[in-house]
Structure formats: structure tokens, C-alpha cells
């Protein structure tokens, strides 16, 4: 793990990475990670893990369009899908740079958490697979509610990664017990002014996050429909928003899966089509 941040040591850190192969690199700067990606990707061995954090969420989410175009060559839209767009735009940038070095990316975990984007990918050296990187690049077209296309049209965001954003086999190995052991810390790790209530709240947040990641891993590892609960009422023409529980039960009765996603806004993923989602929402009012 070679922590990277902008400062006097940046050139030195890049030189270290280029001169020695690593199996695991974590790029975690303040702001955009773009200037570090080329060196980091070159420095990964034939098979290795690259983790990237981006805090320039205004660019990735679409509110800073000139920065997005300059850094990522992409455009975003400020709406319910901007958080998912942000992770996919970052993944597309990593995939493009990796392909320049004959490497392909295989997503492990991608999420928008608080005020940053965090992605983990497995890099593999392969000219043949790297040459196919564009097969997973496209645009999110705002239709009903959206679809991915390899060409932009109408109201769109992208280009972005349109392939899987999770690896279910890996993510489903996560357990609440293990996460609490690693992330919750010891009593000496907590701020001095934290009460028992604060500590308990922190533990519950860890449990909730791991549960959502584990439950959604299977769907996010394949083609899926992402639905924003706050948009569903208007789309279905109903006044009261259906609960997540009611939607999950209704979709299950029709033979479909659904999982609550770890997003800043209430969203779920499903393998159902949009018309089925609307029918369930109307029957759940």
C-alpha cells in the first residue's frame, strides 16, 4: 500500500511505482486520482489489485462539467443516477488507461460512499482482453428510466463503464463479524468525546453497509436495472411511495430479485424490467 497525495513527494512516488512491480496499489489522493493512474497501472504486476479513491465528486457527478470533460473526458447529469454514473465514469477512465498498457480491468467493488468514489479492480496483463475494453464502455441514455448504449443520443451521461461493478464471489465473502473486527476498532481508537450511543451508531452503520453490499452483490455483478425510490412514485403515477419491503415482496412474487443498494439516496437493483417494476409499485401503494 503506497499512499499517494499531492505534494513535494509526488514525482518520487511515481518513480518508485514505475521502477518496481506491485501486486496491490491503493491510490488515495485529495481530489482527482487521474494524474496518478498511468504510473499506478504501469506499476501493477501481471496480475494485481488497484484501488482508487476520487473526492472530486462535483466533476464525476455532473455539476462541474468542464472539470469532468477535462479530467475524465465525460459528461454527467445531476439526477438520481449521478452517484452510479460517478463510479462508472471513474471505472471507464481506469479501463482506458489500463488498455494503453495492455491490461484489462475486472471489477471487484465500486461504490459512492459519503463524499467520495471508491473502486477496486483486478488488473490482468493481456493484449487480447485489453483490446476489448470498449465493449464495456457506453452512455446512460435517460429514457424510461434509462438504458445503456454504445452511442450517445438525447439526454445522456458518459462515456462510462457499462459492465459489472461488483464481483459477487468476492463481496459475498464479507461478513458483519469480520467487518466489525476490522473497522469498528478498539475503545482506544474512538474520539475522546464519543458516547456509547455514538459507538453503537458507528457499529450499526458498518453492519448496514456490509449487509447492503452482500445482498446486492449478485445483482450488481450482472446486468441489472437500478431504480431510485424517490422517482418511482411519479413514474408509476401514485401519490405514496412504496416501501422497499413491499417492492421486494412484489417482485419476488413475480419471480424477480431485488436488493437495496449502498447509495446516498434510497435505490434498489433488480433483474426485472421497468414495466414490471411499475406494476409492482402500483399494486403496492
Model-derived regions, located:
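Single conserved hydrophobic/aromatic residue that forms the stacking wall/gate
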Residues: 1-12
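Short alpha-helix
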Residues: 86-99
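Conserved Class I S-adenosyl-L-methionine
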Residues: 67-80
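A short acidic, Gly/Pro-enriched loop at the edge of an enzyme's catalytic core
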Residues: 15-23
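A short SAM/SAH-binding and catalytic strip from SAM-dependent methyltransferases
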Residues: 22-35
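Polybasic, low-complexity RNA-engagement segments
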Residues: 114-119, 124-285
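A short glycine-rich, Lys/Arg-flanked "PGG" loop and its adjoining helix->strand segment in the class I
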Residues: 37-48
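Conserved beta-strand signature within the Rossmann-like core of class I S-adenosyl-L-methionine
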Residues: 47-56
Amino acid at each position: 500500500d503506497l499512499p499517494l497525495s499531492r505534494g513535494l513527494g509526488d514525482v518520487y512516488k511515481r518513480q518508485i511505482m514505475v521502477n518496481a512491480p506491485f501486486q496491490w496499489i491503493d491510490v488515495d489522493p485529495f481530489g482527482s486520482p487521474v494524474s496518478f493512474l498511468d504510473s499506478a497501472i504501469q506499476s501493477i504486476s501481471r496480475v494485481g489489485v488497484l484501488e482508487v479513491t476520487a473526492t472530486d465528486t462535483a466533476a464525476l457527478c455532473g455539476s462541474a462539467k468542464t472539470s469532468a470533460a477535462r479530467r475524465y473526458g465525460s459528461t454527467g447529469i445531476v439526477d438520481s443516477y449521478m452517484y452510479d454514473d460517478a463510479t462508472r465514469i471513474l471505472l471507464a477512465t481506469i479501463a482506458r488507461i489500463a488498455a494503453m498498457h495492455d491490461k484489462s480491468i475486472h471489477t471487484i467493488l465500486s461504490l459512492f460512499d459519503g463524499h467520495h468514489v471508491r473502486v477496486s479492480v483486478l488488473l490482468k496483463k493481456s493484449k487480447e482482453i485489453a483490446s476489448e475494453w470498449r465493449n464495456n464502455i457506453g452512455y446512460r441514455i435517460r429514457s424510461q428510466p434509462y438504458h445503456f448504449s454504445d452511442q450517445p443520443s438525447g439526454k445522456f451521461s458518459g462515456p462510462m463503464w457499462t459492465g459489472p461493478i461488483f464481483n459477487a464471489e468476492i463481496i459475498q465473502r464479507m461478513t458483519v463479524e469480520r467487518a466489525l473486527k476490522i473497522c469498528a476498532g478498539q475503545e482506544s481508537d474512538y474520539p475522546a468525546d464519543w458516547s456509547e450511543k455514538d459507538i453503537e451508531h458507528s457499529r450499526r452503520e458498518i453492519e448496514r453497509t456490509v449487509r447492503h453490499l452482500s445482498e446486492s452483490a449478485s445483482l450488481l455483478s450482472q446486468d441489472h436495472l437500478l431504480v431510485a425510490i424517490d422517482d418511482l412514485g411519479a413514474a408509476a403515477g401514485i401519490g405514496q411511495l412504496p416501501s422497499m419491503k413491499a417492492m421486494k415482496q412484489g417482485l419476488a412474487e413475480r419471480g424477480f430479485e431485488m436488493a437495496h443498494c449502498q447509495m446516498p439516496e434510497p435505490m434498489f437493483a433488480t433483474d426485472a424490467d421497468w414495466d414490471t417494476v411499475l406494476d409492482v409499485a402500483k399494486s403496492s401503494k
